[in-house]
Amino acid sequence: MLTILVLVIGGYFVGSLSSAIIVARLAGLGDPRTQGSGNPGATNILRLGSKRLAGIVLLGDALKGFLPVWLAQEVGANAWAVAGVGLAAFWGHLYPVFFGFRGGKGVATGLGVLLGFSWSLALAVLGIWLSIFWCWRISSLSALCAAILAPFLAWWLVPDSAIRFAVVLLAIFLLWRHQDNIRRLLSGQEDRASKQN
């Protein structure tokens, strides 16, 4: 029980390490929460003008979702504990203790968590994201579609009910964090990525 508690708390703290804020500050770009879209994520770093830094942020956010889940599995935690660790890492990204509980929307970190849960699930969700983005060039729309379909894919691809339940919660929180994007999509005001991006 103590090991599980340590893993969950550790997952939250790892998730709280905001890659976008750390990378942007080290690169002299300031706080991404006060620039561009105001979201501390890879898309906003790209919007601020650096593909290289956006790639680093994307990788960092995905890894902080994947690594705690992987570690929990390596130490033999049961499915419910693994699910809890994944959710903790995800919530750490959304509400980071190190950055005033003002975090990102969880797309890359959520994908990292899914990869830890099931590589086939992660690939299926990524495939949906890429397909939608290729058609419409709207990052938020891609994330929303992937989040909506993720629980159904989990039901099909993942045998553990604990992991399925965790994926449902991940999807709900990701949709919740995209409320502003949903409003802009409905009003036709959401930004599209340029062809150069």
Swiss-Prot record:
Single GO molecular function: acyl-phosphate glycerol-3-phosphate acyltransferase activity
Enzyme class: transferase
Pathway per the UniProt entry: Lipid metabolism; phospholipid metabolism
Bilayer-spanning residue ranges: 4-24, 53-73, 81-101, 113-133, 153-175
Recorded coiled-coil stretches: none
Membrane topology recorded in Swiss-Prot or TrEMBL: Multi-pass membrane protein
Gene Ontology biological-process entries: phospholipid biosynthetic process
Substrates-to-products reaction catalysed: an acyl phosphate + sn-glycerol 3-phosphate = a 1-acyl-sn-glycero-3-phosphate + phosphate
EC number: 2.3.1.275
Keywords, comma-separated and alphabetical: Cell inner membrane, Cell membrane, Lipid biosynthesis, Lipid metabolism, Membrane, Phospholipid biosynthesis, Phospholipid metabolism, Transferase, Transmembrane, Transmembrane helix
Compartments (UniProt record): Cell inner membrane
InterPro entries named among the record's database cross-references: G3P_acylTferase_PlsY
Broad class of the protein's primary localization: membrane
Function: Catalyzes the transfer of an acyl group from acyl-phosphate (acyl-PO(4)) to glycerol-3-phosphate (G3P) to form lysophosphatidic acid (LPA). This enzyme utilizes acyl-phosphate as fatty acyl donor, but not acyl-CoA or acyl-ACP.
PANTHER family, alphabetized: GLYCEROL-3-PHOSPHATE ACYLTRANSFERASE-RELATED (PTHR30309:SF0), INNER MEMBRANE PROTEIN YGIH (PTHR30309)
Subunit structure: Probably interacts with PlsX.
Protein name, UniProt field: Glycerol-3-phosphate acyltransferase
